[in-house]
């Protein structure tokens, strides 16, 4: 037994040795693994955006686990690892999700890249927000970066050329309003501008908004998206979201912009030679040399181009100082801006001071509240465009503006002095506006919130006009002026419930229900002075005589009450449906039609979510959209539906009242039925995004002043008279073809086509307004006049067959008439002569097209459509390139298919006096001698037929392609700035606005719009000219 034990020891020893070695190795491995895991148990870092600003709320998840955290207010995070994959996933709405291997790192700092168009990006809609992927309406968006690239003074300038179906025109000089048209003109006289909603508050004017305060602008173009705003949404809705504070350490941002601008185009005006030629030819002379007997005299040599005299270098300086920040319970944003702009025309300028404070509170986990307060003071030094620009176009070139002693040449007859008017006339607009908007939101239950808002708007405007003696006729002109004070104020209260709940991860139900009350007040006082005692004192205590017909005061008011609701259903983020209804009651309409109903429905299908599409990995989104809605327009004056009486009517020396307006109890809403069909496509990991929309907008019960028989004692009555339709297509393409660590290329293109048609009018024959004809079956904007076919070369050239075919006269070597031929064959038949006002036309007269074939040209029968002021095609194209902090961008916009009537040319070319100087083309291109082949007729003053009516010779194409903006800049690397310790962001940029324009238009600018008159687009009486602006900018954040 002892031996056995001895034999067993080596075996046991061997086994123990092997087991012990294994055990030791296991302990060593375990120790290494534990130590390794402990070494990697915590990873910290900071997450920033591409602009170097920390991003709070970024999800940081360990891949394959539920372990993770979110970044704090300063973008910092700390995550403790658990066994699993050593990879961190970083995700945040609007940014690309990134996966980063941990390896052996303890600190991982990361810069998130913004997605070109995130499907999870939030889009603002009426009374709420929605993921872009779930939007089933036609919504265009512009962010703050795009807005700031053109250094706009007016918020609307920043969206010019960037959104399909949206046309923006800048009117007037410094401080002038911009005009915006969405999907064509759908009204006659009820206002064509959209509704503006700022942070949920409806406003009538956005000139008091500093573009630097805007975070984004969302344009609701289709009826169903806008219908929740009911009676004000027929022309679309522009939703403006202003900037707000972000959690984190308080930041201070300084923006500074400085620019110079100059006139980039001149209107052709006649020189002294041409004026002398005109004076000779207008009397019937055939001397076209332009020479005069006193050819060495001062006036014969003098050439005065008023445009050179009134233009100047424009200068603009703009600075914004903003503070923002916040904590867990509150956040704030406060920006104060100052703008000082001197126009490119003497006497014009603009100053603006704005302040915007926005505070948001989380009172507890159920209640949030906030307030926004703004104040704006604007000072616009304007000029009377008609008395300056139109006058300069026809002023004699050999008449001085300033005498040799330095005084202004006084005005006499029709020889106005545009320089004196630009520099001395007072045409000032001063206004102060203020806004207060408050909200409280309460979470009543999971998915259910109640929100109430209360907003106030106030605006006080003072208009001051004064015409000193240097600007009135020296013989009988009187120093005159005007002072008008307008006061606008309104309040609105909104109360609504919002519901959003998802059931079983399949069914998402959203709901909205609420009511609102709005009321507006308007007051004015107007003082009009026919004559001042002198121009030393320009206040109204120096008035010698008032105009009692226009001096007075008045006040109006109107109210709007509304109920609204919306419900939406989403199945598996695949099938989408939304329906809404709004019921509005307006005090502006007749007693029989106070209330209007505005329903809408939207349908959407994400085909890309279907199983049969999953294999097509390059398609991120394929969505079909369809919608139908009825929207309204109530933008008419107050009290237009009721009979009005005014005092001041005397009978037997007794003051009494008399009717001044007929009532119309059936006056009601304009209603626009809108259909929209669209498709959205996102490809290649959202690098390419395409949207296509087809729309049809039909407006019924158009509001207009209808002429009535004079026997009633009134000239017209406001009524609902007909319908108009807009049909069109829109295409938007956005892409990011190249994107890597160092270089990014972003490009976009948009295109729109619109066709307009008047479907019905109360009078089937239509009606005229200005130089336009409105008639059934035709488009709005049709210019109405005579068709000019050329100029008769000879007296004998006025010869036609009874069928209206023009004959060819033949002459011998001595210019003696021989005979007529028709198609090369001698003609011996009957001959008709074209007449104007029963007077036979001669050589040098205009060949007007005879519309009815009676060989007598008259206004009733021979005018026709000679042009149209509405464009067919419009859009824009942009590119941006980013490389290692440098960025370069440019923006084109274009417009095709519309015309302009050159009214300024019409006035100076057709004037019968010897004071207005015609255009250079009119003088040098005039018929003088028999046989002349010319564009323009004889200048002989006795030929009144050549000066009659609007005609096609003054219609020009308004087509253009404009390089609207180019910008070059550099943003300093955040790592470099961090070493300084006190600068978070620093960027420099230089840009040029209105670089150049490809157009054949002869005037200052082919972008005319309609200047508030929807029925008369494209009428050019010379407005404030376009300008090229060179800008430098600095942005720094501390």
Swiss-Prot record:
The keyword Transmembrane applies. Induction: By ulvan and rhamnose. A motif (TonB C-terminal box) lies at residues 1021-1038. Pfam families: CarbopepD_reg_2 (PF13715), Plug (PF07715), TonB_dep_Rec_b-barrel (PF00593). Keywords: Cell outer membrane, Membrane, Receptor, Signal, TonB box, Transmembrane, Transmembrane beta strand, Transport. It comes from the Bacteria. A motif (TonB box) lies at residues 120-127. It is a multi-pass membrane protein. Residues 1-39 form the signal peptide. Its main location: membrane. Residues 131-243 form the TBDR plug domain. Belongs to the TonB-dependent receptor family. NCBIfam families: OMP_RagA_SusC, SusC_RagA_signa. TonB-dependent receptor probably involved in ulvan degradation. Ulvan is the main polysaccharide component of the Ulvales (green seaweed) cell wall. It is composed of disaccharide building blocks comprising 3-sulfated rhamnose (Rha3S) linked to D-glucuronic acid (GlcA), L-iduronic acid (IduA), or D-xylose (Xyl). The TonB-dependent receptor may mediate transport of ulvan oligosaccharides from the surface of the outer membrane to the periplasm for subsequent degradation. This is TonB-dependent receptor P39. It comes from Formosa agariphila (strain DSM 15362 / KCTC 12365 / LMG 23005 / KMM 3901 / M-2Alg 35-1).
């Amino acid at each position: 037994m002892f031996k056995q034990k001895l034999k067993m020891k080596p075996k046991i020893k061997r086994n123990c040795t092997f087991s012990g070695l294994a055990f030791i190795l296991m302990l060593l491995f375990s120790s290494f693994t534990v130590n390794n895991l402990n070494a990697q148990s915590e990873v910290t870092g900071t997450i920033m955006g591409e602009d170097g600003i920390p991003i709070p709320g970024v999800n940081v998840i360990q891949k394959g686990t539920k372990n993770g955290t979110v970044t704090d207010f300063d973008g910092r995070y700390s995550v403790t690892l658990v066994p699993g994959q050593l990879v961190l996933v970083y995700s945040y709405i609007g940014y690309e999700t990134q996966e980063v291997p941990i390896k052996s790192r303890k600190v991982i700092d990361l810069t998130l890249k913004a997605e070109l168009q995130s499907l999870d990006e939030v889009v603002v809609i009426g009374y709420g927000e929605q993921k872009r992927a779930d939007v089933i309406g036609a919504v265009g968006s512009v962010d703050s970066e795009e807005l700031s690239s053109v250094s706009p003074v007016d918020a609307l300038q920043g969206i010019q050329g960037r959104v399909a179906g949206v046309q923006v025109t800048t009117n007037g000089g410094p401080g002038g309003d911009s005009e915006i048209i969405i999907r064509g003109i759908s009204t006659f006289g009820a206002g064509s501008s959209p509704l503006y909603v700022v942070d949920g508050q409806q406003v009538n004017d956005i000139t008091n908004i500093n573009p630097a305060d805007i975070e984004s602008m969302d344009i609701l173009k289709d009826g169903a998206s806008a219908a929740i705003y009911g009676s004000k949404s027929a022309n679309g809705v522009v939703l403006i979201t202003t900037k707000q504070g972000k959690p984190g350490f308080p930041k201070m941002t300084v923006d500074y912009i400085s620019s110079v601008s100059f006139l980039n185009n001149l209107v052709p005006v006649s020189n002294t030679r041409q004026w002398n030629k005109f004076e000779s030819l207008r009397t019937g002379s055939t001397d076209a040399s332009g020479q005069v007997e006193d050819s060495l005299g001062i006036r014969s040599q003098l050439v005065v181009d008023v445009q050179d005299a009134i233009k100047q270098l424009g200068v603009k300086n703009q600075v914004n100082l903003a503070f923002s920040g916040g904590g867990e319970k509150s956040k704030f944003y406060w920006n104060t801006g100052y703008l000082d702009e001197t126009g490119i025309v003497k006497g014009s300028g603009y100053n603006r001071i704005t302040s915007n404070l926005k505070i948001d509170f989380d009172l507890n986990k159920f209640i949030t509240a906030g307030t926004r307060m703004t104040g704006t003071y604007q000072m616009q030094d304007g000029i009377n465009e008609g008395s300056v620009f139109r006058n300069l176009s026809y002023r004699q070139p050999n008449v001085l503006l300033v005498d040799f002693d330095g005084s202004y040449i006084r005005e006499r007859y029709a020889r106005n002095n545009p320089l004196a008017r630009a520099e001395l006339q007072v045409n000032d607009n001063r206004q102060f506006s203020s806004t207060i908007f408050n909200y409280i939101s309460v979470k009543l239950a999971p998915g259910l919130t109640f929100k109430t808002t209360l907003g106030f708007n106030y605006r006080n405007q003072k208009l001051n006009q004064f015409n000193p003696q240097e600007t009135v006729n020296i013989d009988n002109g009187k120093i005159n002026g005007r002072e008008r004070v307008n006061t606008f104020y309104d309040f609105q209260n909104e109360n609504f419930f919002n519901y959003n709940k998802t059931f079983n991860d399949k069914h998402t139900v959203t709901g909205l229900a609420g009511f609102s009350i709005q009321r507006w007040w308007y007051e004015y006082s107007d003082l009009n002075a026919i004559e001042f005692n002198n121009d030393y004192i320009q206040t109204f205590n120096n008035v010698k005589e008032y105009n009692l017909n226009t001096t007075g005061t008045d006040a109006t008011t109107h109210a709007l009450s509304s109920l609204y609701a919306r419900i939406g259903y989403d199945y598996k983020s695949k099938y989408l449906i939304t329906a809404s209804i709004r019921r509005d009651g307006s005090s502006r309409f007749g007693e029989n039609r106070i209330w209007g109903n505005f329903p809408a429905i939207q349908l959407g299908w994400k085909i890309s979510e279907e199983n049969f599409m999953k294999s097509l990995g390059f398609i991120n989104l394929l969505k079909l959209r369809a919608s139908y809605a009825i929207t309204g327009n109530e933008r008419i004056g107050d009290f237009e539906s009721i009979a009005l009486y005014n005092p001041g009517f005397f009978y037997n020396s007794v003051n009494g009242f008399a009717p001044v307006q007929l009532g119309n109890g059936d006056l009601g809403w304009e209603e626009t039925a809108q259909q929209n069909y669209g498709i959205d496509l996102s490809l290649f990991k959202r690098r390419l995004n395409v949207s296509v929309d087809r729309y049809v907008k039909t407006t019924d019960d158009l509001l207009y002043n209808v002429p009535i028989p004079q026997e009633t004692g009134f000239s017209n009555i406001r009524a609902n008279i007909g319908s108009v339709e807009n049909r069109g297509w829109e295409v938007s393409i956005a892409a990011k073809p190249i994107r890597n660590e160092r270089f990014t290329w972003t490009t976009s293109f948009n295109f729109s086509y619109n066709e307009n048609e008047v479907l019905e009018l109360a009078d089937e024959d239509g009606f005229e307004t200005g130089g336009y004809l409105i008639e059934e079956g035709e488009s709005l904007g049709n210019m109405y006049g005579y068709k000019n076919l050329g100029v008769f070369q000879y007296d004998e050239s006025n010869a036609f067959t009874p069928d209206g075919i023009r004959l060819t006269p033949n002459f011998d070597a001595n210019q003696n008439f021989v005979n007529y031929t028709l198609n090369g064959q001698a003609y011996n038949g009957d001959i008709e002569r074209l007449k104007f006002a029963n007077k036979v036309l001669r050589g040098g007269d205009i060949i007007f097209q005879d519309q009815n074939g009676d060989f007598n040209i008259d206004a009733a029968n021979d005018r026709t459509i000679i042009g149209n002021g509405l464009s067919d095609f419009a859009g824009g194209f942009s590119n941006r390139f980013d490389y290692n902090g440098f960025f370069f961008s440019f923006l084109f916009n274009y417009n095709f298919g519309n015309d302009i009537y050159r009214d300024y040319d019409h006035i100076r070319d057709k004037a019968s006096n010897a004071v207005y100087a015609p255009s250079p083309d009119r003088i040098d291109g005039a018929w003088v001698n028999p046989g002349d082949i010319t564009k323009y007729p004889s200048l002989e003053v006795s030929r009144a037929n050549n000066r009659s009516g609007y005609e096609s010779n003054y219609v020009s194409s308004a087509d253009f392609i404009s390089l609207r903006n180019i910008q070059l800049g550099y943003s300093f690397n955040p790592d470099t700035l961090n070493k300084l310790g006190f600068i978070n962001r620093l960027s420099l940029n230089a840009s040029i606005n209105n670089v150049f324009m490809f157009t054949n238009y002869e005037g200052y600018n082919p972008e005319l719009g309609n200047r508030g008159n929807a029925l008369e687009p494209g009428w050019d009486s010379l407005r404030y000219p376009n300008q090229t602006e060179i800008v430098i900018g600095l942005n720094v954040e501390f």
